[in-house]
Amino acid sequence: MIISPGTMRLADWRAVQEGDAARLDAGCRAAVEAAAGCVAAILERDEAVYGINTGFGRLASTRIEPADLATLQRNLVLSHAAGVGEALPAPIVRMVIALKLASLARGASGVRWETIEALQGLLDHDILPVIPAQGSVGASGDLAPLAHMTCALLGIGEVLGAAGREDAAAALGRAGMAPLVLGPKEGLALLNGTQVSTAIALTGLFRAERLCRAALLTGALTTDAARGSDAPFDPRIHALRGHAGQMAVAAALRTLLAGSGIRDSHRIGDPRVQDPYSLRCQPQVMGAVFDLLGQAGRTLATEANGVSDNPLVFAETGEVISGGNFHAEYVAFAADQIALAIAEAGSLAERRIALLVDPAHSGLPAFLTRAPGLNSGYMIPQVTAAALVAENRMLAHPASVDSIPTSANQEDHVSMATHGAMRLLRMADNLSHVLAIEYLMAAQGIDLLAPLATSAPLGRMHAVLRESVPVLGEDRLMAPDIARARALIESGAAERAAGCDALPELDA
């Protein structure tokens, strides 16, 4: 895949994360070299410019001698490589490098083309720096984690190779790459930027989208298992309100439930007038979820295509101007939006789970077992779902409101985008378990309604689960069933089995 700076779509970044080979468009070289020429001209004029021949942060007024400029950049990288915690997963690191390439290649950072080639070499040879997940406050960019990325270019620290962790210098040597000697401004350009928080937030976005699509599948299966009505999904209702996500979700639910024998069995003469909100209001809730994910996706797509360095080089005028593009507030807000979407999707799913185990609402045997009392059935999986949803509600607290000043109050407002994005991965794990539990229970409900049959799409989704998880008769160990159902959701196998083309998609 070609990385074309400024024009990448979400689908392109998804491909990078999933392991597609990525190479920067060579047409960017002229812009990169023009900006590097501006930096060289500033040094020729002996002009004091932040990040080129000055200190950093609160030390910006300290002038650095020409003989010390290479040491300045190296010291910057080493001193800022202060991250802690678990290493970021390889797919995220791969996306971090690709995002940094796309930003530098816009020709506003002043780095040399050979530095671009060194970064490209990490991707080409799958040399992935070990980047600790903790230590960034999301302004001035993701300094600590990007310093760890840059250390690998210098042959310092560890990288992830085919055989696990190894010395960066050894990995570079095996790939025929020499450790990079940083030129003026290059350390700052590599460290400044929102690429880590953006890569993590994109990962959270992609998982949230996949899981929320799965939530429509499990929600439809639950609706049929609980003998819910499809009348609330009538397109006329949703057209009157006008929200795109709501209309799309209603259309998906109509498609999923069309032709259900279970629905036809109670279409006439059903004494129930209205279903509980967790069934009836799925378009309104999940529509809002998808619209929120869409908004977050558009924000992150813009961020991924932008330049978040400082200062910025404007080659057409020869100016170098300090600003604040490193501030990741947009990413932090997007991460907070994704967190809200994940939390609400799980909250709605848990209420459907609770409905299924309650005979008063579902009309099914208590806890979905034919012999309640002797068997507990699905009693405790509902408790597990409640615990996971409670945790996600706590994690959904906005990260962006928790600014803590840094760098002796020079950097006195920060975004906290990076840990705001990191919590999305845990929240997605929790949601996938909740949906796995709903999948199991809704399928059990369908079995308890036999010989009535569900719709064709939901029937295929039910059948693929039954290939690895049998109907629950007597009580058995539940954890393996949850794990198998979760694997079908995370892999997309459940969605592929349903074969529904009407599920909403991100389009940024």
Swiss-Prot record:
InterPro entries: Aromatic_Lyase, Fumarase/histidase_N, HutH, L-Aspartase-like, Phe/His_NH3-lyase_AS
Pathway annotation: Amino-acid degradation; L-histidine degradation into L-glutamate; N-formimidoyl-L-glutamate from L-histidine: step 1/3
Reaction(s) catalysed by this chain's protein: L-histidine = trans-urocanate + NH4(+)
Record-level GO BP terms: L-histidine catabolic process to glutamate and formamide; L-histidine catabolic process to glutamate and formate
Pfam families xref list: Lyase_aromatic
Gene3D superfamilies documented for this protein: Fumarase/aspartase (Central domain) (1.20.200.10), Fumarase/aspartase (N-terminal domain) (1.10.275.10)
One MF term in the entry's GO annotations: histidine ammonia-lyase activity
Compartment(s) where it occurs, according to its Swiss-Prot or TrEMBL record: Cytoplasm
PTM remark: Contains an active site 4-methylidene-imidazol-5-one (MIO), which is formed autocatalytically by cyclization and dehydration of residues Ala-Ser-Gly.
Sequence positions bearing 2,3-didehydroalanine (Ser): S140
Chief location: cytoplasm
Name of the featured protein: Histidine ammonia-lyase
